[in-house]
Amino acid sequence: MKKRIMISTAILVLTACVLAGCSSASSADKDHLARVKEAGKITVATEGAWAPFTYHDADTNELTGFDVEVAREIAKRLGVEAEFAEGDFDGGLTGVSRGTFDMMANGVDVTPDRGQTFDFTDPYAFDRAVVVTKAGNSDIGSFDDLKGRTTANSVGSTYAQMGEEHGATVVNVPTLGETMELVKNGTADATINANTSVQDYLNTTGDTSLQIVATDEEVTMYAIPLKKGADNDSLREAINGAIADMKKDGTLSSISVKFFGSDITKE
């Protein structure tokens, strides 16, 4: 009898292990989109300090902005909730590349270098880079004039890279407001930034101590970066589908007008 009990127990344990293994294998076999849907949420990296793309409302302190609301709408159309993780720009990109975050919504522009690390969705907005200096400045009138100068930008941003490519020394600053302060007090000679953000800053603050002195000829395309690999193919397709539907039904345009006063979703 004792022997039979031991054999029966062994069979039960073996059966449990096999079932657990099957369950684990089943979970491992699911791609990124399936895991997101199973979790009921999609984690979104964002700065929360770069108006009007991602920032906190002054009255409610609620996280909002063009990219934030676009991400929320995408999540809604995927049938899940958007869970935001705030941090610096470079950390957000690193988190996506390592799989810590599912995606990033933060005015991330598509570049060849980033294309080696990330799989991008279709672009959902378009912009141009501009050079901003103190009003009255006559020494800097183009991107080439930044050589030997100091610019203020977020670490890891395309704008910081542009500054370095034009021979500038880049000071890393976490927020747009701090960036502008460094330019105004002379700590930085200039900043390269998104035209939309600069225009919003100038209009919102009424600041007349700054000026735009140059605009990049190339159009900046904003898209959502995902960790590179086939595991993300279905998620990218689903997000692309959501973006296409948002363009078609006017939702994307409405969000743009709400935060920029114009439609930047068309090239």
Please state what every model-predicted region is.
Residues 126-133, 199, 203-241, 262-267:
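Periplasmic-binding protein-like
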Residues 28-105:
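Extracytoplasmic small-molecule ligand-binding "clamshell" domains
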Residues 84-94, 138, 156-157, 171-185, ...:
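Short helix-initiation/N-cap motifs at beta->coil->alpha
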Residues 46-51, 63-76, 127-177, 195-197:
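Bilobed "Venus flytrap"/periplasmic-binding protein-like clamshell domains
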